[in-house]
Regions:
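Noncatalytic alpha-helical scaffold of FAD-dependent oxidoreductases
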Residues: 2-178
Length: 178
């Protein structure tokens, strides 16, 4: 069993990261379980889902047969991409024994910012920023409490070149104030 945290550490040591952003469920979470669950974190809109980055899988089906789908490289164009079906299958199609995943170089810079504002303003800002050339990587809205349900917190992660992240962070500060 290969743990998700071990994979993240191994990739970080090489200046790389997964091409998608899976949630972290603790030290016992496995890479096969991560793919089988098919869950995506707040960067799904920009980074894509797990299934978008599965290149190939080996699995053990219910008849104890080892099956191989896909490959180890991006160029895999023959027939159905069955390996993508494994993402989110929760193990119903078989137990994943090996998986090939797309990885990317780590971004040179990232910044996570949070601001308190109304839900309407948060949606307007995200819509505006999404239509601009800003390095918006992830966002999360956390609803206010029962006393102020229309107020909440908008978390935004900028990721990319150092200058782009700095400019986007400053842009966010200005836009939130207006």
């Amino acid at each position: 069993l290969f743990r998700s945290q071990s994979l993240a550490s191994l990739l970080a040591g090489q200046g790389q990261c997964l091409a998608f952003e899976p949630p972290h469920f603790g030290s016992e979470a496995t890479v096969g379980g991560m793919v089988a669950a098919g869950l995506a974190g707040p960067a799904r809109a920009s980074a894509g889902a797990v299934r978008d980055h599965v290149l190939g899988v080996k699995l053990l089906n219910g008849l104890a047969q080892e099956l191989t789908f896909g490959g180890q490289v991006m160029k895999n164009v023959a027939g159905y991409d069955v390996s993508r079906f494994m993402a989110g299958s929760m193990g119903c199609l078989g137990v994943i024994t090996e998986v090939s995943l797309k990885v990317l170089p780590q971004a040179p810079s990232q910044a996570t910012m949070v601001c308190s504002l109304s839900q309407e303003k948060a949606l307007n800002l995200l819509h505006r920023w999404g239509g601009q050339a800003l390095p918006l990587h992830a966002s999360l809205w956390v609803q206010g409490d029962a006393a102020t349900p229309q107020q909440g917190h908008l978390w935004v992660r900028w990721q990319g070149a150092v200058a782009a992240v700095q400019a986007a962070s400053e842009r966010m500060r200005v836009d939130v104030k207006t």
